[in-house]
Structure formats: structure tokens, C-alpha cells
Design a protein with these regions (language model features):
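A short, exposed helix-loop element centered on a Lys and neighboring polar residues
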Residues: 130-131
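Canonical Rossmann dinucleotide-binding motif of NAD(H)/NADP(H)-dependent dehydrogenases/reductases
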Residues: 3-36
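A glycine-rich helix->loop->beta "capping" turn
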Residues: 61-64, 84-97, 103, 111
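Active-site loop of short-chain dehydrogenase/reductase
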Residues: 7, 63-64, 91-92, 137-140
């Protein structure tokens, strides 16, 4: 594993699943990690994990992580999440755009409001994250 000592990573969608594992992997390689997602508390037992449980687990294993509240539907939240990461760690070198939403069912049965939600979380949010992160990534 290549060393990421001195690097800072922001992982969106890091409260569970692939994002959680990416955050933990990057931390194990030495990166400081901003664990970003909107999940601050478990509201559905089928979806365990929060930004706090993931960042706590990283810190308990000797890594460096902070929880960052970031709602991919909210442009201000995305900008604030990038700013908080840079303020806390001093730089931003890596972005993992992992946040996504899945609405089960066929295209024929999906509601229009769910299409809007998918658009906001799966396309618009990641583009906004890259827009706000790009100036910091270019400095890295």
C-alpha cells in the first residue's frame, strides 16, 4: 500500500458501505480523512453507521478523521463540507465521490420526485463537490 502520509482525503457517502471502507483504507494508508455524509444518527436499523461511528473507528485505530455533515442535495452544505475539511486539515488532496441514492423499482414505476432526488444526489451533488474541491485539489 502506498503511503498517503501528509495527504487529506474527503470521502462523500462515508457513513456506511463502500464509502466507509474507502475512508478506513485511506486512513490506514496515512491520510487524514473527512468522513462526509448526511447521516449523523441511525434512523433505520437496516442502514447502520454514521459519520461519527466511522470517524471514531478510524481515530480508535490510530488514524486521523473528522465527521463532516454533507448533504449532497444542498449546495451550501457541500461548500461548507469542503471548507470545513480544509480549515481542519489545511489542505485537500483526494476526493472520493461515493455518495449516491438508489430508488428500487423500474423506470416505469418510479415517481417524478424520486427522479429529482436521484438527479440531485447522484449527479448534481458530485459535480458541485468537484467544483468546490477543485481549487484545493489544484494546489495539491
Amino acid at each position: 500500500m502506498a503511503s498517503l502520509e501528509g495527504r487529506t482525503a474527503l470521502v462523500a457517502g462515508a457513513s456506511r458501505g463502500i464509502g466507509e471502507y474507502m475512508a478506513k483504507y485511506l486512513a490506514s494508508a496515512g491520510a487524514k480523512v473527512a468522513v462526509a455524509a448526511r447521516t449523523t444518527e441511525v434512523t433505520d436499523k437496516r442502514l447502520p453507521g454514521t459519520i461519527h461511528t466511522v470517524s471514531d473507528a478510524i481515530n480508535e485505530q490510530g488514524g486521523t478523521a473528522i465527521p463532516v455533515v454533507m448533504n449532497m442535495r444542498d449546495p451550501e452544505s457541500i461548500a461548507a463540507g469542503v471548507s470545513e475539511t480544509v480549515e481542519q486539515f489545511g489542505s485537500l488532496d483526494i476526493v472520493v465521490n461515493n455518495a449516491a441514492i438508489l430508488v428500487p423499482g423500474s423506470l416505469e414505476s418510479v415517481l417524478d420526485r424520486h427522479i429529482d432526488l436521484i438527479w440531485q444526489v447522484d449527479l448534481r451533488g458530485p459535480l458541485l463537490l468537484m467544483k468546490h474541491a477543485l481549487p484545493h485539489l489544484q494546489k495539491a
